[in-house]
Amino acid sequence: MLKKSLVIIISALIISSFAACTGNAGQSSSSSSSASSVTSGSSVSADSSSSGNSSSSGSEEVTFSGYEKGIIDTTNLFTKRDLTQTADTSSAKTLEVSDGQTLKITEEGVYVIKGTAKNCTIRVEADDTAKVQLVLDGVSITNDSTPAIYVVSADKCFVTTGADSTLSVTGAFTADGDTNTDAVIFSKDDLVLNGTAALTINSAQGNGVTGKDDVKVTGGTYNITSALDSIEANDSIAIYDGTFTINSSKDGLHSENSDDDTKGYVYIHGGTFTINAKSDAVQATTYLQVDGGTFKLTAAEGFEATSIQINDGTIEISASDDGINGTQKSNSVGTPSIEINGGKLTIVMGQGDTDAIDCNGNITVNGGTIDITAQMSSFDYDGTATYNGGTIIINGEEVNSIPQPQMMGGGMGGQAPNAQNGNGFGGNGFAR
C-alpha cells in the first residue's frame, strides 16, 4: 500500500513539472513574437498586455513638499515616479528609429528608443489615462520641420535619457492641423524630463521644449540651443534637479497661460543652470519660486514674474536691463512683489538705465546675501521696501537698509534729485 501511494505521488510531481515547463516555454515564445512585431514597422501600436505600465517604473505616489511658506503650493508637485531617474525596462519594448518614418505609440508602457534617423517623429497618441515612458538610449534624430517627439495625447509622458542623445530640427516648423508644433519636443499633455545622461536639443527656428500642460524636469543633463524659448510651458515649469546649459535667442525658461491667470508659474527646487538668453533667463507670468540651485544667468533680465520669492540658492546674474524684475504680468496675483528669504545673490548690471532689483510693487528682504554692482540703480520699487535681515552689499559697501528708488529727470545739465551718482545707492535714504 505504501509503495502504491509513493508511486502515485511521484507520478503527480512529474506531470506537474512537465506542465510548468511547457507553460514557461509558451510564454517565452509569445513574448519574443510580440517584441519583433512591434519593431518591424514604421507605425507602432503597442499591445498593452506585453508592455510596461506605470507601476512597473515607479509609483505615482506623491512624496515631495517644498518650502512651507512658499508662494507656490508644492505639496503634490512631484511623484515618486517623476523623481526616479531610471526606468524599469523589464517589460519594455525596444523600438528603433529610421529615416522618414513615424513611430506611433498608442498604449501605456515603457519604450526603449534606439538608433539614428532623419525626418523621424516619435508620436505618442495614447488614451488620456495612459502613462507612457520613452527611454532614449543613444538616439539621434534630425528633422527638417517636425518635432522629434510629439505627444498628441496621454495622461503623462516621461522622456528619460538613459544614454547621451541628440534631437534637432533645422528648419521652420510645420503645423499639425490647428496645432502649432513649434518645438523639438512638443507635448499637449503633462511632460516629465528625467534620466542619467545628456540630452542635446537644437531648434534652429523654434522652441526647444514646449508643453501645453505642465512640464517637469527632475534630473539629467540638458544642452539646449533655440531660436525661441528653450523650455516653454502653458501651465507650469517645475524643476527638481538637473544640469542645464541653455543658449536662447528669446527666454531660457518661460511659463505663460493666457487663458488661466492662476497658472503660468515656475518652481525651482534645485539644479545647475547656465543660461544665456537675449530676453529673460527665467520668466513666469504669475509666480516664480526658487528654493535652491546654482545659477549663472546672462540675459537682458535674470528673473521676471509678477511675484518672485527666493528662499535659497547661489545665483549670479549679469543683466543689461533688470537683474530681478517683479512686474504686473498677471492680474490674478495682485500687487507685484519680490521677497528674498535666503541664498546668495550676486547681481552685476550693465551700463545705462538699469535696475538690479526692480519691482512695480513691494520688496521684502528677510535674509540671504545680496551683492550688487550697479552704476545706476540698485533697488527700484513703486510700493514699499522692508528690510528684516540678511546682508546687502552695494558696490562693495554693506548697507543696513534698502536704498530709496532713483528719481529720474533733472534736465540736460543737472541730475535727478535722488540720483545715485554712479554709486548704486538710491538717493538720500540709504544707511552705510
Regions found by a protein language model. Name each.
Residues 2-432:
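A composition-driven surface/loop motif
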